[in-house]
Amino acid sequence: MDDILELAHILSPGTICGEGNVSGRDVNFKSNSFWIKASGTSLDTLKQDDLVACHLNAVPFNVKDKPSMEVLFHAWIYDNYDEVNFIAHTHPTNTNKILCSESCHEFANRRLFPDQVVRNGRKSCLVPYATPGRPLRDEIKKQIEYFVDEEGFFPKLILLENHGIITTGSSYKDCVASSLMCEKSAEIFVGARLLGQIQYLTEHQIMAVDKDPNEAYRRKIF
């Protein structure tokens, strides 16, 4: 639980009231349960009592507990992708500037600098806007499955149009690094656009970074 709380506290700056949610697999019952932020709680003040234990069907162990309304997509990801141990969903300001614009497809499919490739992958999965709750879970499922079929890997960064981002990882530090790198990339994207035409990495340059054994080692260390 401590890692989930640390994840929440690190990603809390800029959040208002109950914005965002975080979760992590239960280390004692890894195969069939996870802990998630309770509805109405805040990332910056999140404590152990604010976490709700849920089955992989999104039903809480204690029916009196009320998990985040986004529990459905957390449950679906854990149930279908064993490599994911932590999930963070936030609404970062610079990234949402892009996700609320026609530039969102460009931001998802192009890359600006090597560390963006390392932390956020060659491409990101872009999810069209859907109402939070079951409609959003269904759209996330549809787009992730399509992305995995097309790209051959699970997305490190999931972008939600007019909403926010989802990052996943084997450790909470993966989620932190991916979330912070996304926001840094968004700030650079907006700044570069203001200065003129953006100069992106080429596909060859992106693949060279992605396949570099030194970068693979850095990923493992981080």
Annotated model-derived regions:
Residues 1-222:
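Glycine-rich flexible loops
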